[in-house]
From Swiss-Prot:
This is HPr kinase/phosphorylase. It comes from Mycoplasma mycoides subsp. mycoides SC (strain CCUG 32753 / NCTC 10114 / PG1). Its EC number is 2.7.11.-, 2.7.4.-. Keywords: ATP-binding, Carbohydrate metabolism, Kinase, Magnesium, Metal-binding, Multifunctional enzyme, Nucleotide-binding, Serine/threonine-protein kinase, Transferase. The lineage of its organism: Bacteria, Bacillati, Mycoplasmatota, Mollicutes, Mycoplasmataceae. The keyword Magnesium applies. The active site is at H141, K162, D180, R247. Signal peptide: none annotated. It is an enzyme of class 2 (transferase). The gene is hprK.
Amino acid sequence: MEKFTIKDLTDNLKFEIISGQDKLDTEIKSYGINRAGLELADYFKPFKDQSEWRATLMSTKESGYMLQFDEETKIKKYTQLMKCGIPVLIITNKFKDKTLIKVAKRLNFPLLRSDYPITIQLVQKIQDIYDIYFSPTAEEHAALMNIFGTGVLIKGKSGIGKSELCLDLIKHNHLFIGDDRIILTNKSNKIIGRVHPILKNLIEIRGIGIFDIVKSNGYQVIMNESPVELVVELVEYKEQNIDNSDRLGNDWSKFKILGVEIEHIQIPVSAGRSLVNIIESAVAQFKINKSKQFENVFDVIHKRTKEFLSSKK
């Protein structure tokens, strides 16, 4: 897990920094957002480790509660809150008590303000950022495309043609997420893939070199991230002169990523095969398999065979 700091939060959500500018490198170690209701009512849950304290949010309800107290009481409550171990305080524009700002500046405590009009939307945005840093993460040497609305992780040994396949898929109006280094994150038991920031929008084609997909094809072919629903593994068509590839369309297996099982299929690569059409067909079949229209191919063949034999009697 990457180190997650107050600065990461402010950079991603463009918060106004009211105080504690020199403490933005403070690490946020606990997942989630806390509302300050109980703490403002003088109840502080004892933690063995200070790092268990979450970032704390205050908005309309907390403001209304605090405005009923005199100045001395408010200063005492805010001071207790800022000294209890929380890493940062976030307020919305709906928080009207200016005493908080006065106390935060006196203590040089990290206080941020958001202009999000709806508090629940702000909480969701913060949680989305947290997911990037706190969720289980892995890295795959692969490419990631979104094909017909389905996130497809394309694996295979180096030099087998993953990048070239991505380029062909882009020409077919499918969306490019990344190539070579794909970062996979488990968010609520769903695998989300994105490219390593260093390689964003870049692709390497042997014989040509590295070039920028945005500059050559435009922003319309780019996605920042995508759920991964299908893993396609490119394999050599023949190994030791034996063709082990599936010919009946029943060889769908599972590929485990961060504890989540993803549909997986191997596609043999050989000269003369149109990989783009094969990949598109594989994704189409995957979508059919998930739909109510799915019918097992062996059942279909068995049914047709019986009908054919019956017609010959």
